[in-house]
Structures are given as structure tokens and as C-alpha cells.
Amino acid sequence: MNQAIRSVEYDRPQGTACSIGQAWAKVPDSPSTHERLALKERIRGLLKREKAVLVAHYYVDAELQELADETGGCVADSLEMARFGRDHDAQTLVVAGVRFMGETAKILSPNKRILMPDLDATCSLDLGCPVDEFSAFCDAHPDRIVVVYANTSAAVKARADWMVTSSIGLEIVADLHARGEKIIWAPDRHLGGYIQKKTGADMLLWQGSCLVHDEFKGVELDLLRAEYPDAKVLVHPESPESVVAQADVVGSTTQLIDAAKNSSATHFIVATDLGILHKMRIAAPGKTFIEAPTAGNSATCKSCAHCPWMAMNGLRNLAEVLERGHNEIFVDAAIGERARLPIDRMLDFAARHKKRVQASGDLAHDTALFSNVGAA
């Protein structure tokens, strides 16, 4: 690495803390077994009536993931959700996730109707990167290429030169660095720092963070590893450096699931949103998954390893949005057209450069492969 990380401090917007509280207040109660079965049957009928397909993120509750799989929908990372929706015949997509995912789906499928169970379901990375402040920051550094993570608003994407996911962010930054480009990175400081450390690129880092991953604690993880010495540690790169440093595998949602499936290990400590455990248990039955610690035993946490905005998606509001057709995502046509450019640039790069990674099942051997791939 030829240069230390350079960063610019920005406070989170005033509404963020309130938004967290409001999100937890809006998390729906779990329905009874009888109501759950009735809601699922109702939703199946409404999906058929509306000729709609359900796309869900790995971080939403298990019952929504199950329903998406059972009805021919998709459970995936954020970019694959949008790709699936773009390529599916359905003209109505119901996105169970957070708002930037709905916006990305609309950008890639501008002529389709995009619905969400709750339009208030947002993301701390999105909230922490308001377009006016970010645009001013970019204007102050006109000599830099602007690279933004998928977890941003359509307006922020429209200000960017490149959009990336963790599947290809490292490769794109490495390519830009090799061409002598200097970079503005937004919004996640931990993922940006990880990529900067790997590539040595000249990067100015926006100081955003994921509410969930930012709370994982390196000291507490070290203590947990002592309790489970044979467990392999799976870490999403949005986590702090002290957590990433202890990982056996650093990767995205999809890649962490694959690592759990393909490894010969039987115990895993998982440092990402606990919603992913549903798919991990399906992919690797009989294996044990332990949540990485977000705080000490007597401490409180804002997320406790589960995104409050993801938790706002439930069976009741899913049925309601299909019944009423409200909560539709709209993206200004000009913004959507401009935001698609950095997305297409990433997809074109992936088509030219991406190679399939074959895993051996040996974590010690595969760690180098997993550390550079996967989507958010």
C-alpha cells in the first residue's frame, strides 16, 4: 500500500437516529400460525391476480424469503434482485427490502411497476449520504472519479461515474488505480477502507456506515472465538477493520452463504445481518451458525445484528400493498437515465472481466478467492 487512507468527516443527518427509532416502532408483530398461513395463501393469490413477482433480500425475515422461493420469485443480494426483476416477464415487481433496492429495480426496469411493503424502509448508508452534500463534496474534488456503492439513492448514483457492489468493487477500483485515476468513494467507510488497503488506490472516503455491520466489535469477537476455537469466521466487508482482520472469509451475502455450504467446517461465527442465517441453514444443513457479537454482555445495541428497516417488511404489509397497489417506487426519468450509466458501466466491466470462482471446499485454500467476490 503506497498511501494511507484519507477521509473526510461528515455527520449523519439529524433524522437518522429518529428514523431508527421509527423503524423499530413500525416493525410488525409476528402473526399467529393461523394468520401466517392465511396471509401466505392470500399473498399467493394476489401475486397471481396482479401478475406480480416477489423479490426479497437475504436480510428480510425468513417467512418472506420462503414465500419468494415458493412463488417463483427470488431471494438474493441487491443487484441480483434488480437483475432478476429486469429479466422476469412480470410487469409488477414487489421488492421486500429497503428503498434503494426498489429504486435500483426501477432504474433497470423503468417501464415496470415497482411496489414495496413500506416506503419508509431505508438504509443508514443511504441516509448518511444526502445528495446535496455529496454533490458539493464531488464538486470540490473535480479531478477524482466518483465511485459509489449500491447502497445509495438514485440521485447519488446519478452523480457517480461508477456504481459497484462488493462483487466487483475491488476489481474496478484496482483497474482505475492502474490507470492512474484518483477516486472518491461513498458511502461505506469500512468497505472503502478495505478496498483501499487491498489496492493502494488514492481514495477519499465518505464517512458513512451500515448500522448493522458498524456495531460488530473486534474485542468481543476475539472473546467469542476463544469460546469456539474450531469455528470459522465469516465477515461482510462493511464491518470494522478489527472484525475483518479476524475473518477466515471476507465476502458478501451470496459469497458467505457459498462459503458456509462449501466448507468442511461445521461451526461458523457470522458477522452480518442475522437474516442471512435462514439461507445458510438451508444451504448447509446440520452446521452450526453463531451470531457475531455487536456489543458486550451488558451493553445495548441499535440493531443487534438485524436491520430495523429490513424488519419493517412483513406478511401483512406485503398483502396490503398487493391488494391496494400503493407504495409504488417512482424515479425521475432524467435521474433514472443518468443513474443507469454507472450501473451499466459496472455490468459491462463485469461482462468483460469477471470470471467464475470455483471453490474447493477448503476454507484455508479458498479464503483468497472469497475475499474479493460477492454482492451486497
Curated annotation (Swiss-Prot):
SUPFAM superfamilies: NadA-like. The keyword Cytoplasm applies. The gene is nadA. Belongs to the quinolinate synthase family. Type 1 subfamily. Pathway: Cofactor biosynthesis; NAD(+) biosynthesis; quinolinate from iminoaspartate: step 1/1. It comes from the Bacteria. Its cofactor is [4Fe-4S] cluster. Its EC number is 2.5.1.72. Catalyzes the condensation of iminoaspartate with dihydroxyacetone phosphate to form quinolinate. Keywords: 4Fe-4S, Cytoplasm, Iron, Iron-sulfur, Metal-binding, Pyridine nucleotide biosynthesis, Transferase. Coiled coil: none annotated. It is found in: Cytoplasm. This is Quinolinate synthase. Gene3D superfamilies: NadA-like.
